[in-house]
Amino acid sequence: MTIDVKSKEILSNLKSTDPEFILETIDKIRESGNRFIVAGLIDLLHETDLPEIKKSVLNLLSELKNKESVPVFIEAIQDEKYAGVRKELVACCWQNGLTYNEYLPVFIDLVINEEFQVAFEAFTVIENMFGRIEDEIIDKEIVKVKDALTNATEQKAYLLNGLLAIVHDIPEEQEFND
């Protein structure tokens, strides 16, 4: 997929030095976001120091419904460049309700290896996960979690034990509570 002219223009607008113009651009993205623009938003989130822009970007990322953005989120979460906004990016994953089931190992690694706040957000993604996951993957991840339990802090042990309780029961279809 190549980047279209409109997306190039939006990405360019996100690099403006005018905060109001950036906020207007973010509002326009709600109607026409694609994976290239999501990557630009993640860059903006990482680079800006302006709270109102961070809030606007996070609101948009947490409302995304474009499944093409899932690999963009995963790539950013795994990139050390974005370590400073990793917690927020992981939170957006459970908030936007997109399907991350094929990335179960990524989120389990986050629970195991990251500081508690990121680990908690990753746990929440797994808790809200749905879709078919191969038994071999689940079995491999359970072994990883059990290994991590041997030298986990009390807080991490709580999350890891929680994973052991839920990972076998990830539903194949999204469940809606009334």
Where do the PLM segments sit?
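Structural detector for internal amphipathic alpha-helices that build alpha-solenoid repeat scaffolds
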Residues: 1, 21-33, 43, 54-66, ...
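Generic surface-pattern signal
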Residues: 15, 147-150, 154, 168, ...
